[in-house]
């Protein structure tokens, strides 16, 4: 009987680990410092047809108080997003704090870059700028209270909607993993094929070199009348 229960239990554990992995990968919260002309970029692995929401706010370094304070409204941030093919998905100027959204149409590494317009702002005065950035991917980007109010969903219906969105996100993650595995397989096959042809080329070169040396030695010995 114990052997019968191990399979389903392992399946549940694996599914739970996958859910935790997906949930951990769906939200990014961090802060970083940038200078006047510095651009900071991040790479985010995103499945296709997935919504991404980024929220940020900026703080400026006060030299007198030696503390970071909320930035003035005049200071802005430029956000640029590129897909795995290098195409610009989003390029827009925002304020000192804001929110940007985009939907991926190609699976893979998306580049998210931010830089300030401080080169035009005298108030920056060569100081530091702290940027708090929170990136939410997939179903974590949904505002469920707003959805519940708009669609007039009960608590049970809202929970069912959340579970369906989570399952959909897991399916997208699995599709993306299969896509990566397929790319890795093609790369491995291409590499193995190149190694094989290079080995064949080396063998042919070695054989031709040996034949040439034998003929050269034969000609040498014949010239010396040793054979």
Curated annotation (Swiss-Prot):
GO terms for cellular component: endoplasmic reticulum membrane. Glycans are attached at residue 117. The chain crosses the membrane at residues 195-212. The keyword Transmembrane helix applies. It holds the Pfam family EMP24_GP25L. Its main location: endoplasmic reticulum. A motif (COPII vesicle coat-binding) lies at residues 220-221. It is a single-pass type I membrane protein. Residues 147-176 form a coiled coil. A motif (COPI vesicle coat-binding) lies at residues 220-227. InterPro entries: Emp24-like, GOLD_dom. Residues 1-29 form the signal peptide. Induction: By brefeldin A, oxidative stress and heat shock, but not by tunicamycin, hypersomotic stress or serum starvation. GO terms for biological process: protein transport. Residues 213-227 are cytoplasmic. It is found in: Endoplasmic reticulum membrane. Residues 30-194 are lumenal. Residues 39-137 form the GOLD domain. Involved in vesicular protein trafficking, mainly in the early secretory pathway. Involved in the maintenance of the Golgi apparatus. Appears to play a role in the biosynthesis of secreted cargo including processing. Involved in endoplasmic reticulum stress response. May play a role in the regulation of heat-shock response and apoptosis. Belongs to the EMP24/GP25L family. PANTHER family: TRANSMEMBRANE EMP24 DOMAIN-CONTAINING PROTEIN (PTHR22811). This is Transmembrane emp24 domain-containing protein 4. It comes from Mus musculus (Mouse). The lineage of its organism: Eukaryota, Metazoa, Chordata, Craniata, Vertebrata.
């Amino acid at each position: 009987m114990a052997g019968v229960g191990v399979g389903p239990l392992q399946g549940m554990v694996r599914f739970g680990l996958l859910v935790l992995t997906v949930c951990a990968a769906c939200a990014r919260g961090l802060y970083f410092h940038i200078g006047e002309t510095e651009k900071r970029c991040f790479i985010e692995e995103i499945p296709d047809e997935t919504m991404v929401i980024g929220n940020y706010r900026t703080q400026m370094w006060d030299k007198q108080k030696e503390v970071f304070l909320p930035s003035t409204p005049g200071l802005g941030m430029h956000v640029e997003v590129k897909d795995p093919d290098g195409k610009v998905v989003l390029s827009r100027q925002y304020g000192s704090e804001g929110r940007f959204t985009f939907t991926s149409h190609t699976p893979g590494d998306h580049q998210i870059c931010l830089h300030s317009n401080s080169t035009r702002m005298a108030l920056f005065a060569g100081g530091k700028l702290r940027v708090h950035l929170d990136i939410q991917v997939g179903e974590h980007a949904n505002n469920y209270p707003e959805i519940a109010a708009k669609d007039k969903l009960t608590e049970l219906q809202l929970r069912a909607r959340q579970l369906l969105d989570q399952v959909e996100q897991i399916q997208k993650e699995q599709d993306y993993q299969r896509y990566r595995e397929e790319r890795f397989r093609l790369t491995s096959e291409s590499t193995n094929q190149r190694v094989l042809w290079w080995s064949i080329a080396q063998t042919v070169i070695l054989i031709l070199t040996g034949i040439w040396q034998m003929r050269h030695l034969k000609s040498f010995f014949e010239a010396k009348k040793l054979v």
